Curated annotation (Swiss-Prot):
Protein's UniProt name: Small ribosomal subunit protein eS1
Record's keyword annotation contains Ribonucleoprotein: yes
Statement: the UniProt record of this protein carries the keyword Ribonucleoprotein: yes
InterPro entries: Ribosomal_eS1 (IPR001593), Ribosomal_eS1_arc (IPR030838)
UniProt GO cellular component terms: ribonucleoprotein complex; ribosome
Membrane-spanning segments: none
One BP term from GO: translation
GO MF annotation terms: structural constituent of ribosome
Coiled-coil spans in chain: none
Assigned protein family: Belongs to the eukaryotic ribosomal protein eS1 family.
Keywords (A to Z) from UniProt: Ribonucleoprotein, Ribosomal protein
Gene (UniProt): rps3ae
NCBIfam families in the cross-refs: PRK04057.1
Length: 198
C-alpha cells in the first residue's frame, strides 16, 4: 500500500477528553485531537446547555467553554459565556411589537469584565423615555449584582431564571414585557477598548 503521509500524521495525534468546569460537575463535553497537550490550550467548544446539564429546560442556551489546562489526556475548561439561540428571540418578533436590546460591560466581584446583552419585546412601540428607563433598570441591577457575585454565580442565576424573573418585576412598573431574556452573557477580554458601566 502506498505511504499516505496525511493518514500517518493523523494516527500520531492524541485524543483529549474535554471536561466542563466544576460548576457543571466536570461532565464530558467531547474530544479534540492534537499532537501535543499545549496545542489544545485555548481551543473552544460550544454546546447546548441542555446537554451539559442534562436539563432540557436550558435548551434555549448554548455554553462557550475554553480549554485552559491539560492533565494527561484530560482537557479542562473554563466557562466563557452563554448565548441564547437567535431563533428563540425571533419567534417573538412581529409587526407592531417593539424590540429593545442593549449591550454593556460590568465588573463581577472578582474584577473580571462581563458583557451583558438583554433583550425585551413588548406588544406595542414604547416611548423613548420608557426605553431609557428600562435600560437604566437592568444596567443598575447588573452593576450592583456584579459587586456581590462572580461571573459563574450570575450565569447560574440566569439559567435558573432567577435574574430574569427579578428584572421582569421591575420592568413591569414601566411596561409589561411579552418576552424578556439575557440573550448573551460572557467574559470580555481586557485587551479590548470598552466602555465600562459603573
Amino acid at each position: 500500500m502506498a505511504y499516505n503521509k496525511k493518514y500517518a500524521d493523523w494516527k500520531r495525534k492524541i485524543w483529549f477528553t474535554i471536561k466542563a468546569p466544576a460548576i457543571f460537575n466536570e461532565v464530558e463535553l467531547g474530544e479534540t485531537p492534537a499532537y501535543k497537550p499545549e496545542q489544545v490550550i485555548g481551543r473552544r467548544v460550544e454546546l447546548n446547555m441542555a446537554l451539559v446539564t442534562n436539563n432540557y429546560q436550558l435548551q434555549n442556551y448554548k455554553g462557550i467553554f475554553k480549554i485552559t489546562k491539560v492533565e494527561g489526556t484530560t482537557a479542562k475548561t473554563e466557562l466563557e459565556g452563554i448565548k441564547m439561540y437567535e431563533s428563540i428571540i425571533q419567534k417573538w418578533v412581529e409587526p407592531g411589537r417593539d424590540k429593545i436590546t442593549d449591550s454593556f460591560v460590568i465588573k463581577d466581584k472578582d474584577n473580571r469584565l462581563v458583557r451583558v446583552k438583554p433583550v425585551l419585546i413588548t406588544n406595542r412601540r414604547l416611548h423613548r423615555k420608557q426605553g431609557t428607563a428600562i435600560r437604566n433598570i437592568w444596567r443598575n441591577y447588573f452593576v450592583e449584582l456584579g459587586k456581590k457575585l462572580s461571573f459563574e454565580d450570575m450565569v447560574m442565576k440566569i439559567l435558573n431564571k432567577e435574574i430574569p424573573e427579578q428584572l421582569k418585576i421591575q420592568i413591569k412598573k414601566i411596561y409589561p414585557p411579552l418576552f424578556f431574556a439575557i440573550r448573551q452573557f460572557y467574559l470580555e477580554p481586557r485587551e479590548k477598548h470598552i466602555l465600562l458601566i459603573e
